[in-house]
Amino acid sequence: MAKYQCPDCQYIYDECKGEPHEGFQPNTNWGEIPEEWACPDCAVRDKIDFKMLADPRCEITQLKQNDPVIKQDNNIIEDTLSEPSILSAELEFTAEKISITDERENTPDNKVERRSQSQAVRRSSVKKIKNNKR
């Protein structure tokens, strides 16, 4: 899929991304865009004036159907797995587990208290100092 650039304002139409605001979904080929279409940024140039920049393959078309697809625009991660909710649940569980491990400390009476890492470090330092004085 190729990229096309407006010679006036440098707007780039990427076939992989499409132009949803103009009604062109991702993977819309340049040939599918009407001839009367004009640059959405400057409206000065018509489709025929655009210059082809490159012919890269979209990540979507190169990957197998069940491979996750990662788009780096705005740090958005999308995946094409048949069960994306399972992956999301696993990530949430892992993140929660890491968070709990980092933020919680067991007290002698088995109550769980939330502590920042700096509080935990200070408490452990105090314990070391007390043990060294004995």
Curated annotation (Swiss-Prot):
GO terms for cellular component: cytoplasm. Its cofactor is Fe(3+). Residues 1-53 form the Rubredoxin-like domain. Residues 124-134 have a biased composition (Basic residues). The keyword Metal-binding applies. Pathway: Hydrocarbon metabolism; alkane degradation. Residues 99-116 have a biased composition (Basic and acidic residues). Residues 99-134 are annotated as: Disordered. The keyword Nucleotide-binding does not apply. Keywords: Cytoplasm, Electron transport, Iron, Metal-binding, Transport. Fe cation binds at residues 6, 9, 39, 42. PROSITE patterns: RUBREDOXIN (PS00202), RUBREDOXIN_LIKE (PS50903). Belongs to the rubredoxin family. Involved in the hydrocarbon hydroxylating system, which transfers electrons from NADH to rubredoxin reductase and then through rubredoxin to alkane 1 monooxygenase. This is Rubredoxin-2. The gene is alkF.
